[in-house]
C-alpha cells in the first residue's frame, strides 16, 4: 500500500462524527445493508467501546443495536470523543507499520504548483508555528471548507449554478456563487433536573433575540424561536424542547441529536442526558463563511 501523511488542523481526527460534533445521518436500513465493511466495523466498534468502558444497564449492554444517546437522527448517536478513540484505534495498525503518519494541529498554509500539478503543500504547526513542507505524488483535500482549492489555485465552483451553466430545468436563471448553506457551530448541552445554569446576557443578546433572517421565501419569524421552515416544503413547523422526553405530537429538538441517554447507563452514572445542538436556531446566515474564512472575523462571530 501507499505511505500516507494525514494532517488535521485540530487535535481530533474525524470530521462530522468528531470535531464537528454531529451524530451520523444514516438511512433507515443501515443496520442490515447499505454500508461499506469498514463503516460497519466503525459502527460496531462504537458500540463495543461503550460496552467495554461504560457502566451500561444490562438491557443496554445486551442490545445488539445499542444507541447510546437514543437520538432520532441516527441509530448510533454517541459522544464525539468516542469516535476519536475508535478512529485512532482503526488507524493504529497503519501507524505502527510506518504506513501512516498523523500530524495533528497542522493547517495548510501554501502550495507549490506547476501547471495543473501540485508538487508540495506547506503546513503550519498551530502550536509552535513551525512550517513543514510535504511532497507527494498527489494530495487529497478532506478539509471542512476545501482549504486546498484556493491555496493550489484549483478551479472550483461555489454556490448555485444557472440554467445556462448546467441546462437543468429547475436551476435558477442566474448563478449565485454566494448561495451556500448556512454555517453552524455545534455544541453539547446537558439537562440536570432542578438546577439553574442561566448565564449573564452575552454580547449582542438583544440583536440575536430579535433577529429575523432576511430570506426569500421568508423565514417564519425570529430565528431564536421554536418555529422553523420544514426543509422539504418550507411550511412553518412548530417544535418543542423537552429534555425528559415527555411524549408530544410536536417535534422534540432535545431528542433529535441526543448523544447520551442517561437511562442507558447505571443509576448515578450521569445526572442528566446530553444533546447535541445542531438546530435551525444556531445557523449563521449573515455571511458567506466559505469566502470570509481567510479574510474576516465573520467566522468568529458565527
Regions found by a protein language model. Give the residues of each.
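Conserved N-terminal/central alpha/beta ligand/cofactor-binding core
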Residues: 9-106, 110, 181-187
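Long, well-ordered, tryptophan-enriched scaffold segments
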Residues: 174-274
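Single conserved hydrophobic/aromatic residue that forms the stacking wall/gate
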Residues: 294-302
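Short beta-strand "acidic-cap" motif of Rossmann-like dinucleotide-binding folds
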Residues: 3-8
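Short beta-strand segments that buttress and anchor functional surface loops
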Residues: 121-125
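Short, solvent-exposed loop/turn and secondary-structure capping segments
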Residues: 9, 15-22, 113-114, 134, ...
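Core beta-strand elements of the Rossmann-like FAD/NAD(P) dinucleotide-binding domain
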Residues: 129-138
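Glycine-rich loop(s) and the adjacent beta-strand/alpha-helix scaffold that form part
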Residues: 141-197
Amino acid at each position: 500500500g501507499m505511505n500516507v501523511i494525514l494532517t488535521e488542523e485540530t487535535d481530533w481526527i474525524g470530521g462530522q462524527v468528531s470535531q464537528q460534533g454531529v451524530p451520523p445521518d444514516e438511512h433507515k436500513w443501515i443496520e442490515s445493508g447499505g454500508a461499506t465493511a469498514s463503516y460497519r466495523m466503525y459502527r460496531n466498534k462504537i458500540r463495543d467501546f461503550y460496552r467495554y468502558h461504560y457502566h451500561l444497564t444490562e438491557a443496554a449492554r445486551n442490545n445488539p443495536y445499542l444507541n447510546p444517546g437514543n437520538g432520532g437522527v441516527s441509530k448510533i448517536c454517541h459522544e464525539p470523543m468516542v469516535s476519536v478513540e475508535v478512529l485512532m484505534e482503526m488507524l493504529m495498525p497503519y501507524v505502527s507499520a510506518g504506513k501512516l503518519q498523523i500530524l495533528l494541529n497542522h493547517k495548510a498554509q501554501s502550495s507549490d504548483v506547476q501547471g495543473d500539478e501540485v508538487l508540495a503543500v506547506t503546513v503550519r504547526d498551530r502550536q509552535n508555528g513551525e512550517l513543514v513542507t510535504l511532497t507527494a505524488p498527489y494530495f487529497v483535500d478532506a478539509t471542512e471548507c476545501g482549504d486546498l482549492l484556493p491555496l493550489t489555485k484549483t478551479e472550483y465552483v461555489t454556490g448555485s449554478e444557472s440554467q445556462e451553466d448546467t441546462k437543468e430545468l429547475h436551476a435558477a436563471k442566474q448563478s449565485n456563487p454566494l448561495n451556500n448553506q448556512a454555517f453552524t457551530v455545534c455544541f453539547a448541552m446537558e439537562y440536570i433536573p432542578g438546577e439553574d445554569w442561566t448565564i449573564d446576557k452575552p454580547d449582542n443578546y438583544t440583536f440575536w433575540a430579535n433577529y429575523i433572517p432576511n430570506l426569500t421565501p421568508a423565514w417564519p419569524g425570529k430565528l431564536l424561536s421554536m418555529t422553523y421552515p420544514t426543509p422539504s416544503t418550507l411550511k412553518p413547523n412548530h417544535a418543542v424542547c423537552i429534555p425528559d422526553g415527555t411524549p408530544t405530537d410536536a417535534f422534540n429538538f432535545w431528542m433529535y441529536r441526543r448523544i447520551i441517554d442517561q437511562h442507558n447507563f447505571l443509576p448515578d452514572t450521569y445526572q442528566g442526558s446530553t444533546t447535541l445542538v445542531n438546530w435551525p436556531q444556531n445557523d449563521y446566515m449573515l455571511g458567506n463563511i466559505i469566502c470570509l474564512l481567510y479574510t474576516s472575523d465573520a467566522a468568529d462571530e458565527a
